[in-house]
Amino acid sequence: MKGQLNLAIQIFKDEYPKKFLHQLVSGQLDMDRLDYLRRDSFYTGVSEGNIGSARIIKMLDVKDDHLVVESKGIYSIENFLMSRRLMYWQVYLHKTSVASEKMLVNTLTRAKELALRGVELFASPALRFFLYHPIDKKEFYNSPDCLENFIQLDDNDIWTALKVWSNHSDVVLSTLSRGMINRKLFKVEVTSSSITKARKEEI
């Protein structure tokens, strides 16, 4: 497994001899972007992200160790770039998406703080591993357990934990968890000036 991980890291860092592989996994036209654009378009009901990814892949070729696109695929590439831009404004940077992400990060951060203090929290085995262990990038590289638990994590682990945490005695954790479950999200306020200290205290 470590050999496969080393190979994947080499490709991702563009240290592997076949340079076009890096472009396939980390570039403006990488496979992940093609995949999530179609997937997110489907699940959000935003038609702008519905691109012809199969046609784009079919039009790709390798020239001098770099990915190239056949001339007849240019319009498909233009459509992909425009679709991605529209998806960012309509979905990824939408105020509800931003608020949800911020609340989830804050909820997990609070859970981690409590766990490291020794507070007992409900969590699946995979989620528990990350809550009760100080994890850094080095451990991801060196620890098979870390990678294995990360692979086991999915949405169900998080949502189940949030439901249980919504009744926890810690006010911060329970409030954030209930907000996520009941969709009572943070409000987004756009301003051109810096937030004053008084406004921060009010919030």
State what each model feature region is.
Residues 1-203:
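Histidine-centered, transition-metal-coordinating active-site segments
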